[in-house]
């Protein structure tokens, strides 16, 4: 069980996280949503101890993070955490040496699924391929908690859609995913829980099954929570063109 209690993080001129509390259990697939600067990436980096938070706590099964349990987490980020001069095969050998839980069969299957070469340096990959490889490594580490930050930036809609189908098929019951993306509609059928962040605060937390029972789509829930103004496009067009747009 991952428990985040009263977490605060401030940068010089901005409160990035403002008393965030969140509990995520084994096997959950959680979507973390919010506008740019809402605190999504900061929260994940605080969970992983990549940056220091000012106050609050992050525990795993009631214990503080140490070198002994940090390996239960993996992180796929579009900032890229791999060794660009090394090949995929070299990465595999490195991970097999350092992570007893490394899932070689999953690694091979995902590399084949995405059609990525094993023998070329990662720096020769396109941006989309680099993001694919980042996700492959995160999923193959054998971690219990897999954090993803805009995992498929630079990939086409077909790759993204197929990946989510594959991911649902390969995840084990104990594997937990915390995923942030702006492509809300694409992950609607994938996630089981939606957590909404706004200005460093959690402003919404709902099970997607409960939203279905209420007759709400995930996008409708997000718009409702953030008080989305449905007429903002028509107002902008009227201001920009000097005429009303009845179809906006």
Describe the role of every protein-language-model region:
Residues 33-35:
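The feature captures the beta-strand-to-loop junction immediately N-terminal to the Walker
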Residues 48:
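Helix-to-loop junction immediately C-terminal to a conserved catalytic motif
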Residues 56-71:
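Conserved ABC transporter NBD signature motif
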Residues 78-133:
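ABC-family P-loop ATPase nucleotide-binding domains
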Residues 146-150:
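Catalytic Walker B motif of ABC-type/P-loop ATPase nucleotide-binding domains
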Residues 209-248:
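ABC ATPase nucleotide-binding domains
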């Amino acid at each position: 069980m991952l428990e985040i209690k009263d977490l605060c993080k401030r940068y010089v001129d901005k409160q990035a996280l403002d008393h965030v509390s969140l509990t995520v259990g084994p096997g959950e697939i959680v979507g973390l949503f919010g506008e740019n600067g809402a605190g999504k990436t900061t929260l994940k980096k605080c969970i992983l101890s990549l940056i220091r938070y000012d106050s609050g706590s992050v525990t795993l099964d009631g214990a503080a993070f140490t070198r002994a349990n940090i390996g239960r987490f993996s992180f796929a980020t579009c900032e890229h955490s791999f060794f660009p001069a090394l090949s995929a095969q070299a990465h595999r050998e490195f991970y097999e040496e350092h992570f007893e839980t490394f899932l070689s069969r999953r690694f091979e299957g995902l590399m084949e699924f995405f059609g990525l070469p094993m023998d070329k340096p990662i720096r020769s990959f396109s941006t989309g391929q680099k993001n694919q490889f980042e996700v492959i490594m995160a999923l193959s580490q054998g971690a219990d908690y897999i954090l993803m930050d805009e995992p498929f930036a630079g990939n086409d809609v077909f790759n993204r859609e197929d990946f989510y189908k594959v991911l649902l098929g390969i995840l084990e019951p104990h594997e937990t995913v915390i995923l942030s993306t702006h492509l809300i509609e694409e992950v609607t059928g994938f996630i089981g829980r939606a957590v909404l962040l706004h200005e460093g605060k959690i402003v919404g937390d709902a099970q997607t099954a409960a939203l279905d029972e209420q007759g709400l789509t995930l996008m409708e829930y997000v718009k409702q929570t953030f008080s989305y103004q449905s007429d903002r496009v028509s107002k902008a067009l009227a201001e920009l063109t000097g005429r009303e747009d009845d179809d906006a």
